[in-house]
Regions:
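A short alpha/beta connector and helix-capping loop motif
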Residues: 55, 62, 79-98
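FAD-binding beta-loop-beta segment adjacent to the flavin cofactor pocket
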Residues: 45-77
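C-terminal helical "tail/cap" subdomain of flavin- and related membrane-associated enzymes
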Residues: 79-80, 94-188
Length: 188
């Protein structure tokens, strides 16, 4: 559904959304017959180029500052990880500050602290980037299995809170098959 590049107005956005509903969710189209935007600012359209920035910036004064969360790790919003990333980054940084005590908070500490956060965030990046591509056959199989298995559906939903849980079964066809089989065996 990468079809938003020419959408410039609220009405065009609403119309494109309704076209998508009619094409992919026709059983819901009738329910959307009288739909309208709440206001002319009630839409969002854009894209983000995923990137990871250097964590430490030197200001004109010579002081160094440590960036955090989505100021450093920019993801497409498709997986809704912006708030998660900010909270997870703040937790990592706070613990690193507390552990560091009264020592100097220099570039080395800042880079090490970011690396601790990156240990989590790299999984968010990998998963989010995978969602920008057409799903491979094993992910389609996984989603189909989730529609028939509450434990599999729960595993997927719960991994939104900690995308590290998606590895390796989201990314590897063999691991995915084993994941599905294990959950089916436990359900039996």
């Amino acid at each position: 559904m990468d079809c938003w590049q020419d959408i410039k107005t609220p009405q065009a956005h609403l119309q494109k959304s309704l076209d998508i509903v009619r094409e992919y969710l026709p059983w819901e189209a009738e329910r959307c017959r009288d739909i309208s935007l709440t206001d002319d600012q009630g839409f969002l359209c854009g894209r983000f180029t995923p990137m990871v920035r250097r964590p430490v910036l030197t200001l004109p004064s010579g002081r160094q500052v440590l960036g955090m969360a989505d100021a450093l790790v920019v993801n497409d919003p498709i997986t809704g990880q912006g708030s998660n990333n900010a909270a997870k980054c703040a937790k990592v940084y706070l613990q690193s500050i507390l552990d560091h005590g009264d020592r100097v908070f220099g570039r080395s500490w800042m880079e090490q602290t970011f690396e601790q956060y990156w240990g989590y965030a790299r999984h968010v990046v990998e998963w989010t980037n995978s969602m920008l591509l057409p799903p491979p056959a094993h992910v389609l199989e996984l989603l189909g299995a989730a529609s028939q298995s509450q434990p599999i559906a729960s595993a997927i939903a719960n991994a939104f809170d900690d995308p590290r849980q998606f590895a390796p079964w989201w990314f590897d066809a063999g691991q995915c098959q084993a994941f599905i089989q294990t959950h089916h065996q436990h359900a039996a």
